[in-house]
Amino acid sequence: MTATLQQRKSANVWEQFCEWITSTNNRLYIGWFGVLMIPTLLAATTCFIIAFIAAPPVDIDGIREPVAGSLIYGNNIISGAVVPSSNAIGLHFYPIWEAASLDEWLYNGGPYQLVIFHFLTGVFCYLGREWELSYRLGMRPWICLAFSAPVAAATAVFLIYPIGQGSFSDGMPLGISGTFNFMIVFQAEHNILMHPFHMLGVAGVFGGSLFSAMHGSLVTSSLVRETTENESQNYGYKFGQEEETYNIVAAHGYFGRLIFQYASFNNSRQLHFFLAAWPVIGIWFTALGVSTMAFNLNGFNFNQSIIDSQGRVINTWADIINRANLGMEVMHERNAHNFPLDLAAGEVAPVALTAPAING
Protein backbone atom coordinates (compact mmCIF):
# COMPACT_ATOMS: atom_id res chain seq x y z
CA MET A 1 0.00 0.00 0.00
CA THR A 2 1.35 3.42 -0.97
CA ALA A 3 0.45 6.54 1.01
CA THR A 4 0.81 10.01 -0.51
CA LEU A 5 0.90 13.24 1.42
CA GLN A 6 -0.36 16.39 -0.22
CA GLN A 7 -0.03 19.87 1.29
CA ARG A 8 -3.15 21.91 1.64
CA LYS A 9 -3.56 24.33 -1.23
CA SER A 10 -4.02 27.32 1.10
CA ALA A 11 -0.66 26.71 2.79
CA ASN A 12 0.98 26.41 -0.61
CA VAL A 13 -0.53 29.71 -1.74
CA TRP A 14 0.68 31.38 1.47
CA GLU A 15 4.21 30.09 0.93
CA GLN A 16 4.16 31.36 -2.64
CA PHE A 17 2.98 34.74 -1.39
CA CYS A 18 5.76 34.88 1.24
CA GLU A 19 8.34 33.95 -1.39
CA TRP A 20 7.08 36.64 -3.75
CA ILE A 21 7.00 39.32 -1.04
CA THR A 22 10.59 38.62 0.07
CA SER A 23 12.07 37.87 -3.37
CA THR A 24 15.00 40.05 -4.43
CA ASN A 25 14.36 39.07 -8.07
CA ASN A 26 11.32 41.33 -8.37
CA ARG A 27 11.84 44.53 -10.38
CA LEU A 28 10.83 46.46 -7.25
CA TYR A 29 11.46 44.83 -3.88
CA ILE A 30 8.30 44.69 -1.76
CA GLY A 31 9.24 43.09 1.55
CA TRP A 32 7.13 42.84 4.68
CA PHE A 33 7.60 46.52 5.41
CA GLY A 34 6.41 47.22 1.87
CA VAL A 35 3.12 45.44 2.61
CA LEU A 36 2.30 48.30 4.98
CA MET A 37 4.27 51.01 3.15
CA ILE A 38 2.47 50.74 -0.19
CA PRO A 39 -1.14 51.23 1.02
CA THR A 40 -0.25 53.95 3.55
CA LEU A 41 1.75 56.02 1.06
CA LEU A 42 -0.95 55.55 -1.59
CA ALA A 43 -3.61 56.72 0.89
CA ALA A 44 -1.51 59.74 1.94
CA THR A 45 -0.72 60.71 -1.66
CA THR A 46 -4.32 60.32 -2.85
CA CYS A 47 -5.78 62.34 0.03
CA PHE A 48 -3.09 65.03 -0.35
CA ILE A 49 -3.78 65.50 -4.07
CA ILE A 50 -7.57 65.64 -3.61
CA ALA A 51 -7.32 68.01 -0.61
CA PHE A 52 -4.78 70.26 -2.34
CA ILE A 53 -7.11 70.61 -5.30
CA ALA A 54 -10.56 70.68 -3.75
CA ALA A 55 -10.67 70.81 0.08
CA PRO A 56 -12.95 73.53 1.53
CA PRO A 57 -11.52 76.15 3.94
CA VAL A 58 -10.40 74.91 7.37
CA ASP A 59 -10.98 76.59 10.74
CA ILE A 60 -7.32 76.17 11.71
CA ASP A 61 -7.36 78.50 14.76
CA GLY A 62 -10.68 77.21 16.09
CA ILE A 63 -12.21 80.71 16.08
CA ARG A 64 -14.65 80.24 13.18
CA GLU A 65 -12.37 81.96 10.67
CA PRO A 66 -11.71 79.32 7.99
CA VAL A 67 -8.49 79.50 5.95
CA ALA A 68 -8.66 78.40 2.30
CA GLY A 69 -5.84 76.17 1.11
CA SER A 70 -6.99 74.43 -2.07
CA LEU A 71 -6.66 75.37 -5.72
CA ILE A 72 -10.42 75.45 -6.31
CA TYR A 73 -10.79 78.09 -3.57
CA GLY A 74 -8.45 80.53 -5.30
CA ASN A 75 -4.93 79.38 -4.44
CA ASN A 76 -2.06 78.60 -6.78
CA ILE A 77 0.76 76.05 -6.47
CA ILE A 78 2.79 78.45 -4.31
CA SER A 79 0.06 79.62 -1.92
CA GLY A 80 -1.90 76.35 -1.76
CA ALA A 81 -1.64 73.82 1.07
CA VAL A 82 -3.44 71.13 2.99
CA VAL A 83 -4.33 73.22 6.06
CA PRO A 84 -3.64 71.64 9.50
CA SER A 85 -6.56 70.41 11.57
CA SER A 86 -8.40 72.85 13.82
CA ASN A 87 -7.18 74.09 17.19
CA ALA A 88 -10.63 73.08 18.43
CA ILE A 89 -9.63 69.46 17.75
CA GLY A 90 -6.28 69.87 19.51
CA LEU A 91 -4.44 66.57 19.81
CA HIS A 92 -7.56 64.44 19.48
CA PHE A 93 -7.38 61.66 16.92
CA TYR A 94 -9.87 62.80 14.28
CA PRO A 95 -10.71 60.13 11.70
CA ILE A 96 -13.75 60.50 9.45
CA TRP A 97 -15.97 58.40 11.72
CA GLU A 98 -15.35 60.76 14.68
CA ALA A 99 -17.07 63.65 12.87
CA ALA A 100 -20.83 64.12 12.71
CA SER A 101 -20.63 64.60 8.95
CA LEU A 102 -18.13 64.76 6.11
CA ASP A 103 -18.63 68.54 5.96
CA GLU A 104 -17.68 68.87 9.63
CA TRP A 105 -14.61 66.66 9.10
CA LEU A 106 -13.45 68.83 6.21
CA TYR A 107 -14.19 72.08 8.08
CA ASN A 108 -12.06 70.91 11.02
CA GLY A 109 -9.15 69.85 8.80
CA GLY A 110 -9.52 66.08 9.01
CA PRO A 111 -7.59 65.46 5.76
CA TYR A 112 -4.41 66.86 7.36
CA GLN A 113 -4.40 64.17 10.04
CA LEU A 114 -5.18 61.49 7.48
CA VAL A 115 -2.25 62.57 5.31
CA ILE A 116 0.40 62.98 8.03
CA PHE A 117 -0.41 59.75 9.90
CA HIS A 118 -0.38 57.67 6.72
CA PHE A 119 2.70 59.53 5.44
CA LEU A 120 4.68 59.01 8.65
CA THR A 121 3.70 55.34 8.80
CA GLY A 122 4.74 55.03 5.14
CA VAL A 123 8.18 56.61 5.58
CA PHE A 124 8.84 54.57 8.73
CA CYS A 125 8.09 51.47 6.67
CA TYR A 126 10.26 52.76 3.80
CA LEU A 127 13.14 53.01 6.27
CA GLY A 128 12.41 49.46 7.46
CA ARG A 129 12.20 48.27 3.86
CA GLU A 130 15.66 49.71 3.18
CA TRP A 131 17.02 47.67 6.09
CA GLU A 132 15.10 44.58 4.94
CA LEU A 133 16.45 44.70 1.38
CA SER A 134 19.99 45.27 2.67
CA TYR A 135 19.58 42.23 4.91
CA ARG A 136 18.33 40.02 2.06
CA LEU A 137 21.25 41.06 -0.15
CA GLY A 138 23.86 40.61 2.58
CA MET A 139 24.70 44.31 2.63
CA ARG A 140 25.61 46.42 5.65
CA PRO A 141 22.62 48.26 7.19
CA TRP A 142 23.80 51.88 6.99
CA ILE A 143 21.50 53.01 4.13
CA CYS A 144 18.46 53.02 6.40
CA LEU A 145 20.51 54.80 9.07
CA ALA A 146 21.22 57.65 6.64
CA PHE A 147 17.52 57.85 5.71
CA SER A 148 16.67 58.14 9.42
CA ALA A 149 17.73 61.81 9.28
CA PRO A 150 14.90 63.05 7.00
CA VAL A 151 12.52 60.65 8.77
CA ALA A 152 13.45 62.23 12.11
CA ALA A 153 12.97 65.72 10.65
CA ALA A 154 9.51 64.86 9.26
CA THR A 155 8.51 63.26 12.57
CA ALA A 156 9.65 66.37 14.44
CA VAL A 157 7.55 68.86 12.45
CA PHE A 158 4.47 66.69 11.88
CA LEU A 159 4.20 64.80 15.18
CA ILE A 160 6.57 65.83 18.00
CA TYR A 161 6.07 69.60 17.62
CA PRO A 162 2.24 69.42 17.61
CA ILE A 163 2.36 67.13 20.67
CA GLY A 164 4.60 69.58 22.52
CA GLN A 165 2.43 72.57 21.57
CA GLY A 166 -0.82 70.78 22.36
CA SER A 167 -2.52 70.86 18.96
CA PHE A 168 -2.09 69.55 15.44
CA SER A 169 -3.02 73.04 14.25
CA ASP A 170 0.60 73.92 15.11
CA GLY A 171 1.96 71.27 12.73
CA MET A 172 3.60 72.25 9.47
CA PRO A 173 1.08 72.94 6.66
CA LEU A 174 1.44 70.74 3.58
CA GLY A 175 2.35 73.40 1.04
CA ILE A 176 5.10 75.77 -0.07
CA SER A 177 4.04 79.08 1.51
CA GLY A 178 2.58 77.13 4.45
CA THR A 179 6.04 75.74 5.12
CA PHE A 180 7.49 79.27 5.06
CA ASN A 181 4.75 80.47 7.42
CA PHE A 182 5.61 77.59 9.78
CA MET A 183 9.28 78.60 9.70
CA ILE A 184 8.55 82.28 10.38
CA VAL A 185 6.20 81.54 13.29
CA PHE A 186 8.66 78.97 14.66
CA GLN A 187 11.37 81.65 14.68
CA ALA A 188 9.04 84.16 16.34
CA GLU A 189 8.01 81.78 19.12
CA HIS A 190 11.19 79.75 19.67
CA ASN A 191 14.11 81.80 18.30
CA ILE A 192 15.32 78.75 16.37
CA LEU A 193 18.08 80.72 14.60
CA MET A 194 19.79 81.13 17.98
CA HIS A 195 19.56 77.41 18.84
CA PRO A 196 22.89 75.51 18.62
CA PHE A 197 21.23 72.39 17.19
CA HIS A 198 19.78 74.39 14.30
CA MET A 199 23.23 75.84 13.68
CA LEU A 200 24.62 72.29 13.49
CA GLY A 201 21.87 71.41 11.01
CA VAL A 202 22.79 74.38 8.81
CA ALA A 203 26.43 73.27 8.93
CA GLY A 204 25.30 69.75 8.00
CA VAL A 205 23.19 70.78 5.00
CA PHE A 206 25.49 73.46 3.57
CA GLY A 207 28.61 71.49 4.45
CA GLY A 208 27.15 68.38 2.85
CA SER A 209 26.41 70.34 -0.33
CA LEU A 210 29.95 71.72 -0.37
CA PHE A 211 31.56 68.31 0.19
CA SER A 212 29.33 66.70 -2.43
CA ALA A 213 30.32 69.33 -5.00
CA MET A 214 33.99 69.04 -4.05
CA HIS A 215 33.96 65.25 -4.32
CA GLY A 216 32.07 65.21 -7.61
CA SER A 217 34.30 67.82 -9.21
CA LEU A 218 37.50 66.13 -7.99
CA VAL A 219 36.43 62.74 -9.33
CA THR A 220 35.28 64.21 -12.65
CA SER A 221 38.57 66.08 -12.97
CA SER A 222 40.72 63.00 -12.35
CA LEU A 223 39.00 60.40 -14.57
CA VAL A 224 41.22 57.82 -16.22
CA ARG A 225 41.18 58.57 -19.97
CA GLU A 226 39.47 55.73 -21.86
CA THR A 227 37.96 57.66 -24.77
CA THR A 228 39.06 59.97 -27.57
CA GLU A 229 38.34 63.68 -27.80
CA ASN A 230 35.45 62.96 -30.18
CA GLU A 231 33.29 60.88 -27.83
CA SER A 232 31.77 61.38 -24.42
CA GLN A 233 33.99 60.60 -21.46
CA ASN A 234 31.04 58.69 -19.99
CA TYR A 235 31.64 55.91 -22.53
CA GLY A 236 34.92 55.23 -20.73
CA TYR A 237 33.07 53.47 -17.92
CA LYS A 238 31.45 50.04 -18.20
CA PHE A 239 29.03 49.04 -15.48
CA GLY A 240 30.63 46.47 -13.19
CA GLN A 241 34.20 47.02 -14.35
CA GLU A 242 36.90 46.09 -11.85
CA GLU A 243 39.30 48.96 -12.54
CA GLU A 244 38.95 52.31 -10.80
CA THR A 245 37.35 54.85 -13.11
CA TYR A 246 39.27 57.76 -11.56
CA ASN A 247 42.72 58.26 -10.08
CA ILE A 248 42.29 58.80 -6.35
CA VAL A 249 46.02 59.44 -5.97
CA ALA A 250 45.82 62.35 -8.41
CA ALA A 251 42.73 63.75 -6.66
CA HIS A 252 44.42 63.38 -3.27
CA GLY A 253 47.56 65.10 -4.53
CA TYR A 254 45.60 67.99 -6.03
CA PHE A 255 43.47 68.66 -2.97
CA GLY A 256 46.36 68.15 -0.55
CA ARG A 257 48.30 70.87 -2.36
CA LEU A 258 45.25 73.13 -2.70
CA ILE A 259 44.54 73.15 1.05
CA PHE A 260 47.06 71.08 3.01
CA GLN A 261 48.00 67.42 3.01
CA TYR A 262 45.78 66.16 5.82
CA ALA A 263 42.69 67.97 4.54
CA SER A 264 42.51 65.33 1.80
CA PHE A 265 41.36 61.74 2.34
CA ASN A 266 43.68 58.98 1.16
CA ASN A 267 41.16 56.26 1.99
CA SER A 268 38.09 55.97 -0.23
CA ARG A 269 36.04 54.21 2.46
CA GLN A 270 36.74 56.88 5.06
CA LEU A 271 35.90 59.55 2.51
CA HIS A 272 32.50 58.13 1.62
CA PHE A 273 31.64 57.48 5.26
CA PHE A 274 32.39 61.15 5.96
CA LEU A 275 30.25 62.29 3.01
CA ALA A 276 27.31 60.29 4.41
CA ALA A 277 27.80 61.05 8.11
CA TRP A 278 28.24 64.84 7.94
CA PRO A 279 24.76 65.83 6.65
CA VAL A 280 23.02 62.98 8.49
CA ILE A 281 24.38 63.99 11.89
CA GLY A 282 23.57 67.65 11.16
CA ILE A 283 19.94 66.86 10.30
CA TRP A 284 19.66 64.60 13.34
CA PHE A 285 20.63 67.58 15.48
CA THR A 286 18.08 69.84 13.79
CA ALA A 287 15.32 67.28 14.35
CA LEU A 288 16.41 67.01 17.98
CA GLY A 289 16.37 70.80 18.28
CA VAL A 290 12.83 71.09 16.88
CA SER A 291 11.74 68.29 19.23
CA THR A 292 13.10 70.13 22.28
CA MET A 293 11.70 73.49 21.15
CA ALA A 294 8.35 71.71 20.82
CA PHE A 295 8.31 71.75 24.63
CA ASN A 296 9.48 75.40 24.70
CA LEU A 297 13.15 74.80 25.47
CA ASN A 298 14.01 77.60 23.07
CA GLY A 299 17.06 79.16 21.43
CA PHE A 300 19.51 81.39 23.28
CA ASN A 301 18.20 84.73 24.53
CA PHE A 302 20.85 87.44 24.49
CA ASN A 303 18.36 90.32 24.47
CA GLN A 304 19.56 93.51 26.17
CA SER A 305 22.77 91.78 27.26
CA ILE A 306 24.97 94.88 27.00
CA ILE A 307 24.28 98.05 28.99
CA ASP A 308 26.37 101.16 29.55
CA SER A 309 27.38 102.67 32.89
CA GLN A 310 24.08 104.52 33.09
CA GLY A 311 22.05 101.34 32.64
CA ARG A 312 21.02 102.15 29.08
CA VAL A 313 20.76 99.23 26.68
CA ILE A 314 23.30 99.05 23.86
CA ASN A 315 21.58 97.08 21.13
CA THR A 316 23.27 94.06 19.57
CA TRP A 317 22.16 91.91 16.65
CA ALA A 318 20.35 89.74 19.21
CA ASP A 319 18.11 92.73 19.99
CA ILE A 320 17.44 93.28 16.28
CA ILE A 321 16.40 89.64 15.94
CA ASN A 322 14.22 89.99 19.03
CA ARG A 323 12.45 93.00 17.53
CA ALA A 324 11.79 91.03 14.33
CA ASN A 325 10.52 88.09 16.41
CA LEU A 326 8.05 90.34 18.24
CA GLY A 327 6.80 91.76 14.95
CA MET A 328 6.24 88.31 13.48
CA GLU A 329 4.58 87.06 16.64
CA VAL A 330 2.04 89.87 16.92
CA MET A 331 1.09 89.47 13.25
CA HIS A 332 0.44 85.73 13.16
CA GLU A 333 -2.98 84.40 14.21
CA ARG A 334 -3.83 88.03 14.87
CA ASN A 335 -7.48 87.39 15.71
CA ALA A 336 -6.75 84.45 18.01
CA HIS A 337 -4.67 86.35 20.61
CA ASN A 338 -5.62 89.38 22.64
CA PHE A 339 -2.12 89.58 24.12
CA PRO A 340 0.82 87.89 22.39
CA LEU A 341 2.81 85.87 24.92
CA ASP A 342 6.03 87.86 24.75
CA LEU A 343 4.28 91.19 25.16
CA ALA A 344 2.00 89.98 27.95
CA ALA A 345 4.87 88.43 29.93
CA GLY A 346 6.59 91.69 30.89
CA GLU A 347 6.82 93.11 34.39
CA VAL A 348 3.66 94.54 35.90
CA ALA A 349 3.44 98.32 35.53
CA PRO A 350 2.43 100.12 38.77
CA VAL A 351 -0.89 101.91 38.68
CA ALA A 352 -2.55 104.43 41.03
CA LEU A 353 -4.53 102.77 43.81
CA THR A 354 -6.72 105.84 44.40
CA ALA A 355 -8.15 108.30 41.98
CA PRO A 356 -6.56 111.77 42.17
CA ALA A 357 -8.66 114.59 43.57
CA ILE A 358 -10.02 116.94 40.97
CA ASN A 359 -10.41 120.51 42.19
CA GLY A 360 -13.16 122.60 40.81
Curated annotation (Swiss-Prot):
Fe cation binds at residues 215, 272. Coiled coil: none annotated. It catalyses: 2 a plastoquinone + 4 hnu + 2 H2O = 2 a plastoquinol + O2. The record marks 161 as: Tyrosine radical intermediate. Its EC number is 1.10.3.9. The keyword Electron transport applies. [CaMn4O5] cluster binds at residues 170, 189, 332-333, 342, 344. A quinone binds at residues 215, 264-265. It is a multi-pass membrane protein. Pheophytin a binds at residue 126. It is found in: Cellular thylakoid membrane. Photosystem II (PSII) is a light-driven water:plastoquinone oxidoreductase that uses light energy to abstract electrons from H(2)O, generating O(2) and a proton gradient subsequently used for ATP formation. It consists of a core antenna complex that captures photons, and an electron transfer chain that converts photonic excitation into a charge separation. The D1/D2 (PsbA/PsbD) reaction center heterodimer binds P680, the primary electron donor of PSII as well as several subsequent electron acceptors. Belongs to the reaction center PufL/M/PsbA/D family. Cyanobacteria usually contain more than 2 copies of the psbA gene. 2 of the reaction center chlorophylls (ChlD1 and ChlD2) are entirely coordinated by water. This is Photosystem II protein D1 2. It comes from Trichormus variabilis (strain ATCC 29413 / PCC 7937) (Anabaena variabilis). The gene is psbA2.
